[in-house]
UniProtKB/Swiss-Prot annotation:
The keyword Cytoplasm applies. The gene is coaX. One of its GO terms (cellular component) is cytoplasm. This is Type III pantothenate kinase. Its EC number is 2.7.1.33. It comes from Malacoplasma penetrans (strain HF-2). It is found in: Cytoplasm. The lineage of its organism: Bacteria, Bacillati, Mycoplasmatota, Mycoplasmoidales, Mycoplasmoidaceae.
Length: 255
């Protein structure tokens, strides 16, 4: 056992990747975190090996968010077996620090609800943008969810393009490139990735700002692809763990 400090285990199961982190109950920085590809056929034995790194911590709380519903029972059983606690799951009766209408409450993914929760902890007027398998954004006005926008992710689109273009199949694309203008096919693709990231954030922010001209609108950017965002027209915060933190906040709001 690491110490007597209580920890919360937070699980975010995405379509492509699963991220698991632990936090001290009273802190917002992750103590330990693991990331691995989501496997719809995973089992208790496999998960137990992955999460064994957390056994040394005094884990007394847990929340599991998932956009892959079939995996929830496996995670429930694994966490209960390893830590002797029952994880909390988001449901239609879950309370939030923001207002959400009935329809989006039923349809919006757990991860985006967690992003909303983190956003309103920063400011009552806020947009959150997640760059991952999908590009997703949420807009909150006066602590109320106005709406969201979802598009195919950069990695998915790039992989499909490389599959179709024979000249690109042996080329290495640097998704971390910050160049705005490409001088050949590869650097042009790298420029496109950079401009798509920054352009999506810029446009979504501006549309929200038009709807809320007199507010101090904040912008939170997160997700595995949230790097090299080049925007000078407004301030933004990049927090890779915003969604995990949102789940943590949801847990303690409901328990």
């Amino acid at each position: 056992m690491k110490n007597n400090q209580e920890y919360i285990l937070v699980v975010d199961i995405g379509n492509s990747y699963t991220k698991i982190g632990i936090f001290e109950k009273e802190k917002e920085n992750t103590t330990s975190i693991i990331l691995f590809p989501t496997d719809s056929e995973t089992n208790i034995a496999t998960l137990s090996k992955k999460m064994n790194v957390f056994k040394k911590y005094n884990i007394k709380h847990s929340i599991v968010g998932s956009v892959v519903p079939k995996l929830k029972p496996t995670y429930f059983k694994t966490i209960k077996k390893m830590f002797n606690i029952e994880p909390y799951y988001i449901s239609e009766t879950t309370k939030y620090s923001f207002l959400i209408d009935e329809s989006p409450n039923k349809e919006l993914g757990d991860d985006l609800k967690a992003l909303c929760e983190y956003c309103v902890s920063v400011n009552k007027n806020c947009i959150g943008i997640s760059f991952g398998t999908a590009i997703a954004s949420v807009y909150l006005k006066n602590n109320s969810l106005v709406g969201a926008s979802i598009a195919a992710g950069l990695g998915f689109g790039l992989n499909k393009l490389i599959e179709k273009a024979s000249l690109l199949k042996k080329s290495k694309i640097d998704k971390f490139s910050s160049d705005f203008f490409g001088t050949n096919t590869i650097s042009a693709l790298e420029s496109g990735i950079n401009n798509l990231r920054s352009g999506f954030a810029y446009n979504f922010y501006n549309q929200a700002k038009k709807d809320n001209l007199n507010s101090d609108l904040k912008c939170i950017i997160t997700g595995g692809e949230s790097y090299n965002i080049n925007i000078s027209s407004f301030e933004y915060e990049i927090n890779k763990e915003a969604i995990l933190l949102g789940f943590k906040k949801i847990y303690f709001l409901n328990n």
